[in-house]
Amino acid sequence: MKYHSHIENLDEDGYTQLDFSTQDIHKRPRGSEKGSQAPSSPWRPIAVGLGILCFVVVVVAAVLGALGEYGHNSGRNPEEKDNFLSRNKENHKPTESSLDEKVAPSKASQTTGGFSQPCLPNWIMHGKSCYLFSFSGNSWYGSKRHCSQLGAHLLKIDNSKEFEFIESQTSSHRINAFWIGLSRNQSEGPWFWEDGSAFFPNSFQVRNTAPQESLLHNCVWIHGSEVYNQICNTSSYSICEKEL
């Protein structure tokens, strides 16, 4: 029998030197242990860059627009600014007539299509005249003066159709009376219109409201559908008329 010696590479003391060489050990690729990773997309950095570029462009455009608007406003000289402000105030400033006059809605404004073009604002057109129902209290003389300042006169009723129109307006304000352009110089004297023409009781009658001892009821107002004489210094509303 032959013995095969398996003792190799003995050192000086007789110990066997073990060879742990890793030449025969084959390591698996790292990718096989953890699994292969998908390569990253080459378009991702490009998309991110384009997004940042667009954002920068929008910001720059907004800043330039704001600077341009500021420069345009600051470039206007003081005189132009003052003129602009003054024109704006004039456009929004209410007129004297709009402050003094108040006009109630009426049937005539509905039947005639509102305030007609030939008449001024707050005036109502009927026939060949414009009428203003003034709701600022005044005496007969003060009302006459007020209508004259507007280029008109106190109401003069020429016929029954005109009286029906006026009655349709005043009937909706039965608690109020309106001065008209009819007066007389003395008690029991004849009535005259403001233009000096005589009054003829064809369309209406003037009812007497004065006691026997009073001599001051020398002016006329219309109250609802009735016409009365009254003291001229009494404060009341009025009706102005202007022919077209």
Swiss-Prot record:
Binding of (1,3-beta-D-glucosyl)n, residues: R145, H146, C147, S148, Q149, L150, G151, A152, E194
Q: Which residues lie on this side of the membrane: Extracellular?
A: 71-244
Spell out the PROSITE patterns in the cross-references.
C_TYPE_LECTIN_2 (PS50041)
Deleted gene: phenotype: Mice were born at the normal Mendelian ratio without obvious anatomical defects but are susceptible to infection with C.albicans. They show impaired myeloid cell activation by fungal particles. Deficient leukocytes display impaired responses to fungi, characterized by reduced inflammatory cell recruitment after fungal infection, resulting in substantially increased fungal burdens and enhanced fungal dissemination.
> What tissue specificity is annotated for this entry?
Detected in spleen (at protein level). Highly expressed in dendritic cells, spleen and thymus. Detected in epidermal Langerhans cells. Detected in macrophages, liver and lung.
| C-type lectin domain location | 126-241
Partners and quaternary state? Homodimer. Interacts with SYK; participates in leukocyte activation in presence of fungal pathogens. Interacts with CD37; this interaction controls CLEC7A-mediated IL-6 production.
Instruction: Please state what the protein is called.
Output: C-type lectin domain family 7 member A
Species of the source: Mus musculus
Gene designation: Clec7a
